[in-house]
């Protein structure tokens, strides 16, 4: 039986937990909202935590009938180069995780899917962002027309799972969410990790938790 992680996310160990006592807005941009919290450390001292509030996102691992996966290449300005990625995108206000996954898959790649499976959730930048990414698998794909956002440019291509895993091992794939997706893909294809597949309107799909922003202690002086 696998060992349990030493710290369950829903029941933090009081010896490690930090408690927010005040918050200051640092930046309120078009995409990013950065804040600075004063937190009480486990030993009673105070410290500052600066981080970005993020609404959450989804990533899709699209499986073609012949076993290939659908990928993208997109230029990422902060790192100055084009990266290989799985399709992904940010949640719109009040948008469900699966609805976002369906929308992003069609907008970015043109594909629609008949079946979906929720894999799990990853936190790509835990040191300075609340961002979470829900991982969805999609199959029964039908090709169609992209509907890219204004100012969005990307190439869509397909690859075998073996090629993708080789690129990950060789450093050709460095995007964190795509590396996490490749781990899921490898374990699903090997049968080690199971998925529950269903049509998009099926009630079996879970409703992944939305963004969990740090809560300030109400009795802070």
Explain the meaning of each model-derived region.
Residues 29, 78, 125-128:
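Short glycine/serine/proline-enriched coil/turn segments at secondary-structure junctions
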Residues 185-198:
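Short helix-capping/linker segments at secondary-structure and domain boundaries
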Residues 54-81, 85-86:
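A glycine-rich, hydrophobic loop/mini-helix early in the fold
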Residues 47, 56-59, 64, 90-176, ...:
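Unchanged
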Residues 1-28, 197-218:
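Extreme N-terminal tail/first-helix region
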Residues 18, 23-59, 65:
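Acidic, metal-coordinating catalytic segment for phosphate/diphosphate chemistry
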């Amino acid at each position: 039986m696998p060992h349990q992680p030493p710290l369950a996310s829903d029941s933090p160990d009081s010896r490690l937990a930090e408690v927010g006592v005040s918050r200051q807005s640092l930046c309120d941009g078009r995409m990013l909202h950065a804040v600075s919290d004063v937190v009480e450390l486990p030993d009673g001292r105070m410290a500052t935590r600066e981080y970005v509030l993020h609404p959450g996102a989804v990533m899709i691992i699209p499986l073609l009938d012949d076993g290939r996966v659908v990928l993208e290449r997109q230029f990422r300005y902060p790192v100055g180069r084009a990266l290989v990625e799985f399709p992904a995108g940010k949640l719109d206000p009040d948008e469900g995780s699966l609805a976002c996954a369906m929308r992003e898959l069609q907008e970015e790649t043109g594909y629609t899917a008949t079946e979906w499976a929720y894999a799990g959730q990853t936190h790509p930048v835990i040191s300075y962002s609340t961002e979470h990414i829900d991982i969805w698998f999609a199959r029964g794909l039908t090709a169609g027309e992209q509907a890219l956002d204004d100012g969005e440019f990307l190439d869509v291509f397909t690859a075998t799972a073996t090629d993708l895993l080789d690129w990950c091992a060789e450093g050709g794939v460095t995007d964190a969410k795509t590396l996490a997706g490749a781990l899921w893909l490898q374990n699903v294809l090997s049968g080690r990790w199971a998925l529950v597949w269903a049509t998009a309107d099926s009630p079996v799909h879970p409703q992944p938790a939305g963004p969990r922003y740090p809560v300030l202690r109400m009795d802070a002086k």
